[in-house]
């Protein structure tokens, strides 16, 4: 079941930003987010893939690959409502839970329906779908993404019950960047990562070039991270293995052999891979944001002058600093 959603017209974006004094510049992005609705961010036409929970898991993951999307809302025909999201994280959890060896077919992936997987995986921990109204502010959207530790937030029309769009950190930051030059620049934009202490610098989850994919999947599950820097024997970053790379196992139908190294698994994208996107502690927040938006990536690896991994800065970290804490270290 696939749906293509088109809105009638391009949303009008307000140009009237509140007048800010130099002392209050640190809250300009917060004010911007509070004065714009989720609807303002929805494009004129966008494709949305929706899965019925009675669909086989395997077919659903192949459909994600075919449509070039990372997640899809789940529709329960019995309840006549959206009940959750199917994401690459589900694919990782299924592979990690049921993989035995390259010689044994993963029955659960081949035969389970989405609803069966959800019953097994969620058991008694069923949570209502986290979603947002198109009339809610972007500030509320950012708050919900960060508070619930999710990467995708469906925008659902409360009247029709239809899913209109899926908000992500990436799309929100890109929208903010379109108007960023219209604001007085907050003081914190010129400060360094080290000064602002934005990002994660302790217990960074990493893998070696020789780490088997199955072990990497276990790290994703245990640490709940979206990417793993791949390092050499000296701790220098040479690649990055992200959750998105895992879906390629479905694309190439190679998910029955998870004993191969992450380096081998990443060869599929070697012809267009431009290298790991990095940053340094002395670089300013403004520089970091520009790099993230221009490269359209979800995180940067913080390194020292020898390319040794020091931390990770994610879009979630950036939005939290810009919108929720006004450049201050997160509470």
Swiss-Prot record:
Gene3D superfamilies: CBS-domain (3.10.580.10)
UniProt cross-references to Pfam families, sorted A to Z: CBS
Domain CBS: start-end pairs: 43-103, 125-187, 198-260, 272-329
PTM field: Phosphorylated by ULK1 and ULK2; leading to negatively regulate AMPK activity and suggesting the existence of a regulatory feedback loop between ULK1, ULK2 and AMPK.
One Gene Ontology molecular-function label: ATP binding
Sequence positions that bind ADP 1: 85-90, 130, 151-152
Biological process annotations from GO: cellular response to glucose starvation; cellular response to nutrient levels; fatty acid biosynthetic process; import into nucleus; positive regulation of gluconeogenesis; positive regulation of protein kinase activity; protein phosphorylation; regulation of carbon utilization
Binding-site positions, ADP 2: 70, 170, 242-245, 269, 277, 298-299
Composition-biased stretches (Polar residues): 1-12
Modified residues (Phosphoserine): 261, 270
Quaternary assembly: AMPK is a heterotrimer of an alpha catalytic subunit (PRKAA1 or PRKAA2), a beta (PRKAB1 or PRKAB2) and a gamma non-catalytic subunits (PRKAG1, PRKAG2 or PRKAG3). Interacts with FNIP1 and FNIP2.
Entry function: AMP/ATP-binding subunit of AMP-activated protein kinase (AMPK), an energy sensor protein kinase that plays a key role in regulating cellular energy metabolism. In response to reduction of intracellular ATP levels, AMPK activates energy-producing pathways and inhibits energy-consuming processes: inhibits protein, carbohydrate and lipid biosynthesis, as well as cell growth and proliferation. AMPK acts via direct phosphorylation of metabolic enzymes, and by longer-term effects via phosphorylation of transcription regulators.
Protein name in UniProt: 5'-AMP-activated protein kinase subunit gamma-1
Source organism (scientific name): Homo sapiens (Human)
Lineage: Eukaryota, Metazoa, Chordata, Craniata, Vertebrata
